[in-house]
């Protein structure tokens, strides 16, 4: 049996690479552009593929950052609230996040109060030891603007090693990595 010419193998390999590149480009084209400032629209929906002034990271990079580099991890998923009008006892489902995270619900909202702004600035200074070069990672859930907004706020506060993990805790869990139960802190916890 005759083998196909090497040029055919090369052609097929090039075609596969072009298709893969086109798929990635199309996926990135589906992402909205970054807004000029903090996103003011609904917090759930398509998010940008970029973070001006910061870095978008994946699960492997995050797992590496947790180890010896000791990154500050901040989960900004909003806290569950008692349903309006509910008179019977209610207890929220325990919130799970990436180990060693600080859960600051509400920090990623489009508009935050002066109290929350001050809390965010002071807590970041405390968590980083006032080191504006310390690696900080913000996350929430997939397609959630809250972590993107919080990362932009940290950049605006002068932090220079700000990272955004857009896959959120779901991507972390999908990789088979552990989570832990967390308690919310700050003004957004009430």
Language-model regions: role of each:
Residues 73-75:
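Structural scaffold elements adjacent to functional motifs in cytosolic proteins
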Residues 11-22:
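Bacterial N-terminal signal peptides
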Residues 78:
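Short, glycine/acidic-enriched loop or turn micro-motifs at the edges of active sites
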Residues 2-12:
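Bacterial N-terminal signal peptides that target proteins for export
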Residues 2-3, 23-59, 65-68, 83-137, ...:
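Rhodanese-like catalytic fold shared by cysteine-dependent sulfurtransferases
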């Amino acid at each position: 049996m005759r083998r196909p010419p090497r040029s055919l193998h090369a052609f097929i390999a090039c075609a596969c690479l072009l298709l893969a590149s086109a798929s990635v480009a199309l996926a990135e084209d589906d992402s909205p552009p970054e807004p000029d400032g903090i996103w003011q629209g609904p917090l759930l929906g398509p998010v940008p593929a970029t973070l001006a002034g910061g870095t978008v990271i994946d699960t492997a990079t995050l797992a590496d950052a947790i180890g010896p580099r000791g990154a500050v991890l901040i989960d900004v998923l909003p806290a569950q609230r008692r349903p309006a009008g509910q008179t019977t006892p209610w207890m929220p489902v325990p919130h799970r996040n990436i180990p060693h995270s600080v859960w600051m619900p509400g920090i990623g909202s489009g508009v935050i109060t002066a109290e929350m702004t001050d809390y965010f600035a002071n807590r970041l200074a405390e968590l980083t030891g006032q080191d504006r070069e310390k690696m900080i990672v913000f996350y929430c859930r997939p397609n959630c603007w809250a972590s993107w907004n919080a990362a932009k706020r940290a950049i605006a506060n002068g932090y220079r090693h700000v990272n955004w993990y857009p896959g959120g805790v779901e991507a972390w869990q999908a990789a088979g990595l552990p989570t832990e139960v967390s308690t919310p802190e700050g003004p957004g916890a009430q």
